Amino acid sequence: MTMNIRRVLRTIAISGLWVALFSMTVEAKTKVTSESFGKMPDGAPVEIFTLSDGPYEARVATYGGIVVSLRVPDRNGKPADVVLGFDNVDGYLANFNGPADAFFGALIGRYANRIAHGSFTLDGRKYSLPLNNGENSLHGGPHGFNNVVWKAKPIANGVELSYLSKDGEAGYPGNLSAVVRYTLMKGDLRIEYSAATDKDTVVNLTNHSYFNLAGKGDILDHRLTLHASRFTPVDVGLIPTGELKSVASTPFDFRKATAVGARIHADDEQLHRGRGYDHNWVLDTDSGGGKLGEAAELYDPSSGRVLKVLTDQPGIQFYSGNFLDGSIKGKGGKPYELHSALCLETQHFPDSPNHPDFPTTELKPSQRYHTVTVYSFSVR
């Protein structure tokens, strides 16, 4: 192991020690178990961890760090799985390596969302990335963090996943040591991301869970609130134009709770380009100093389930399941139809490495990447 890689791992280990010391002061109430979830094509085992806290249950796989299922009670106390996915690792392997990769429930890296033409310049050097979304690189390319097996260990109230992305992997510079911690407590699924590098690089991590709070049907009647006065318009390739546009008097104004389907078919150029909503909103919450702010709220009137999204990130991608067309058969062989779920992906803005005016995603060896997102469930 090279000296640089040792230094990166040491940085992550020290940060992990502080988390462990803090966790020792918190009573662990969530039951954490693990079992086999299948095997990779090369025979490598894949585990699935089950986090159980009363009526709440999350299952997380070591392949792709996938949130495989998330069971949440409705207003009558009846639980249902509120995320899309597959019954076993074979389903994810087929989807993630096929032409209709939907990234169901997966950890996304090294760079969430799109990078135009699969290239960016850092410190005067141009880097080229594999293309997997037309002329662009999407969610780290065809061999991103969703398509690797993470090392895992149980921690208080959850599971810790770690992965070393080597220098040059998927075209990105630097040995990047990433650690992601999933914890479940009292209806809060907390995702904590950390990373360190031995060379200047770019990092933007998120989770790509598809939510349907009813556990069935479509999400067009879900009420969505986004705490954002601006969004980033996109070109025909869904790459930000660089403009930060006001949502006022547009179908993108979700500052007050609005049904997802209320304006999704409006005659709007941006909606036409995304075939619905597939855009980044610029959050109004102050993310300075790592403080968590409420980014979004989703409410399903039929079940009473409420999802609040809290984050310290500057943006959130709202994707309304526009490319689901029934061709993908998910859990129990159920076809995932148009708008059968939506994504709320906390993030830095798409294509930030090519937009100097956007919040930076650069990470230096002297820095530590750290961000937290909480998906908080309740009923109304």
Question: What is each PLM-predicted segment?
Answer:
Residues T2-S15:
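Bacterial N-terminal signal peptides that target proteins for export
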Residues M1-T2, T241:
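N-terminal amphipathic/basic-hydrophobic helices that include classical n-h-c signal peptides
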